[in-house]
Amino acid sequence: MITPPKNPALGFTLLEILVALIIFGLMSVISFRGLSSVAQSRAHLAQENRKWSEVALLFARLEQDLSMLANRPVRDAANLNAAPLVAKSILQSESDTQLSFTRMGLPDQGNVLAAPTRCGYRLQGERVEQLIWPATDAAPRTIPTVNLLMENVAAVEFTYLDSTGTWHSRWPLPDSDMVFPAAVQMVLDLKSGERITRLFALPALQ
């Protein structure tokens, strides 16, 4: 009769090894999914931060431009007199804008104001653009500088408040002596589904 050794050699059975491999594989999958979820969350957060930063910068740019309104009539590309602030809902040319106005020049390094310029805003495709003309009186072939302010925008709507508290989609108003509206409202519809409304009170320059 053979007596088994008192201290048998220690080791893992094949079944134990397979169970350990399965557990290790499951833990690896869970860890990978967790890291992937964290990476996706970070990317989404960065995209959201960038989107809202662009919205804030767009509103800040328009607010700055509107705060520098100048009551100076201009001549348009057709050599016709145009009001200091012009608003339309339908664009008719490549350089046309939904909102355009005369803006005081910015100060240079010597704190001397530059000459007034013509400034405009529009939605072109899915892009909100600012247009700057080199002179207030536009020659027929004057090409404005186009600055991209924001992308992925579904719609932009401007409305204008008169002295009676009525909102209008165009400016100037027929049979009215109001040069500027009391306020401008901008409604921004983003491709991601949000709608943002911002009201800009205008300086009293009538």
Question: Can you name each region flagged by the protein language model?
Answer:
Residues 109-113, 140-142, 169-170:
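Short histidine-centered beta-strand/loop micro-motifs
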Residues 152-206:
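Short linear sequence signals and composition-biased patches located at protein termini or domain-edge surfaces
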Residues 65-75, 148-149, 198-205:
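Juxtamembrane/interfacial segments around transmembrane helices
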